[in-house]
């Protein structure tokens, strides 16, 4: 589970409303996805992100269909699996960026504590796009995790 939480935002609807307004407000005001991406991506990445990664993420977000983006944002704010989290018994690897404000490390750590078989990692200087910002680090964490899981099954 990379840069995610068991539910969107807190239990306060004001966060959801602010999240939607920040993402859809510029589109409602006439901006296109490319313009929104230039604002949104720098706000969610950490200092570890390279200039090239930043530009690639901006370009990728800029190509998202606006209607699809609106639907994604509307759906995202309804996500809530807190009540089901305890049902996950298989091994889980949780990875957070230390600078991620969308899926904060403290929230992911709490989620890991609520899972029966979880490991939790924080990637220093990474933001919400942790796997793109620090791919070698994330790949090393995942490789070690998969090797541990495989060795337990073989043993």
PLM regions and their residue ranges:
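Flexible "cap/lid" loop of the alpha/beta hydrolase fold
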Residues: 1-29, 37-38
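Short, surface-exposed alpha-helical segments at coil->helix boundaries
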Residues: 17, 38, 42, 54-55, ...
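Short alpha-helix in the alpha/beta-hydrolase fold that links the catalytic acid
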Residues: 74, 90, 104-113
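Catalytic active-site module of serine/aspartate enzymes centered on a nucleophile-bearing elbow/loop
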Residues: 117-155
